[in-house]
């Protein structure tokens, strides 16, 4: 997280220094070029639109310039960019391209690829940062409905007059995240909101009854799967100034043989209950990182490194932690619920969302709300959320998700 702040601050400083109107572009400092993903940072092979990536130079140039792009880590040749060379027209400092699937269904397991700037057309131009990491996953699998589920769905149509199949399978959504005033600089490049298009896989929950329809999002719930993984990494393995400086964190990562490109992170959301008035219940009473009962969005996380940590803890494994020149041995079972753990729930969605736990003025808190409108063909959610176990955000982030139903 602190590295993220430093990176943004450095690039902002370069922009400020480079923007003096009285300085000739032929005499200016190095023109740094940075790549950032717009919205989601993961997609499945069957998604045609891929991921949009923005490129920004520190200052405008008085002629057309370009950068050549290179993809690293794509061992299966599963993706491509829509442009090999990205052109910045004279007088502009932004351009964009897309990372696209080759639509060949080549992956059996996910891969993490990186798009970097390979070369620049002008000697003043210099790549800034490490490029953009994008996770490419195998084609999404839609769970088949059982005979019992089909019977329930038919019953809802007859008795309630609703067709649940309009919101099941792969459903498109638009996600808008609003950041608090004190958080937008560090977490959203100074912008108030971040909007992206997502897709979720939705099915009928095992909790559904003949009287009450209940949905389960089994893939990319709320369109936020890759965003959740992004912020989880930023407050753990990508936080070089705190998490990664803790000896216990280093010991745990070594013990579980953490390897980012090979790790998987999946999220589901069960218990979305449709009421007869069209409202949706989707919150639940859960424990926070301190063991207190609070209201949360019951996202369920499956993180491969955390699964290994739990297994090793159950087997009685220990780790050796360097404590200032001396070595101490700890049971992994004692580290499952403290800072340094790889448990996603320790860092994600920490605060109570039934009331405003931050108490800021103005506040970014919003009362959780869900509703469905079959006439308009939309399903909508609004809720507050946070991350970082209280050490990173100054307020909630405010999330608004709108699903478009099938015809």
Residue ranges, per PLM feature:
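Acidic/polar, low-complexity intrinsically disordered N-terminal segments immediately downstream
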Residues: 20-177, 181, 401-407
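Ser/Thr/Gly/Pro-rich, low-complexity flexible regions
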Residues: 144-407
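Positively charged n-region of N-terminal signal peptides that target proteins for export
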Residues: 1-6, 10
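Intrinsically disordered, low-complexity regions enriched in Ser/Pro/Gly/Gln/His and often acidic
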Residues: 9-12, 299
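C-terminal motif of bacterial Sec signal peptides marking the signal peptidase cleavage site
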Residues: 15-18
């Amino acid at each position: 997280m602190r590295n993220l702040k430093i990176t943004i601050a450095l690039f902002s400083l370069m922009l400020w220094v480079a923007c003096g109107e009285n300085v000739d572009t032929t005499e200016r400092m190095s023109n740094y070029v940075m790549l950032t993903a717009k919205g989601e940072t993961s997609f499945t092979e069957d998604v045609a639109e891929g991921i949009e990536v923005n490129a920004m130079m520190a200052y405008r140039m008085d002629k057309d310039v370009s950068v050549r792009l290179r993809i690293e880590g794509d061992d299966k040749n599963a993706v491509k960019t829509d442009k090999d060379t990205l052109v910045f027209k004279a007088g502009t400092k932004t351009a964009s391209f897309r990372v696209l699937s080759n639509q060949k269904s080549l992956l059996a397991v996910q891969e993490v690829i990186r798009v970097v700037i390979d070369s620049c057309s002008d000697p003043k131009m210099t790549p800034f940062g490490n490029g953009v990491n994008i996770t490419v996953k195998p084609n999404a699998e839609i769970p088949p409905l059982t005979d019992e589920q089909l019977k329930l769905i038919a019953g809802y149509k007859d008795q309630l007059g609703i067709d649940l199949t309009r919101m099941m399978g792969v459903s498109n959504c638009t996600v808008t995240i609003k950041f608090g005033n004190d958080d937008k600089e560090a977490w959203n490049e100074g912008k108030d909101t971040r909007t992206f298009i997502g897709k979720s896989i939705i099915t009928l929950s095992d909790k559904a009854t003949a009287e009450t329809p209940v949905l389960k999002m089994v893939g990319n719930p709320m369109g936020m799967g890759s965003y959740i993984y992004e912020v989880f990494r930023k407050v753990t393995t990508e936080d070089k100034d705190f998490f990664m400086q803790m000896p216990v964190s280093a010991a745990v990562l070594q013990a579980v043989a953490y390897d980012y490109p090979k790790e998987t992170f999946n999220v589901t959301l069960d218990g979305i209950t449709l009421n007869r008035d069209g409202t949706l219940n989707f919150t639940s009473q859960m424990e926070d990182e301190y063991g207190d009962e609070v209201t949360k969005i019951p996202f369920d996380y499956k993180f491969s490194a955390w699964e290994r940590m739990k297994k090793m803890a159950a087997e009685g494994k220990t780790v050796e932690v360097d404590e200032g020149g001396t070595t101490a041995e700890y049971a992994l079972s004692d580290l499952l619920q403290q800072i340094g753990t790889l448990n996603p729930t320790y860092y994600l969605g920490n605060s109570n969302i039934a009331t405003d736990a931050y108490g800021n003025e103005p506040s970014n808190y919003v009362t959780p709300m869900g509703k469905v409108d079959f006439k308009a063909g939309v399903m909508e959610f609004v809720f507050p959320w946070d991350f970082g176990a209280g050490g990173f955000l100054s307020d909630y982030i405010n999330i608004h998700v709108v699903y478009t139903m099938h015809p």
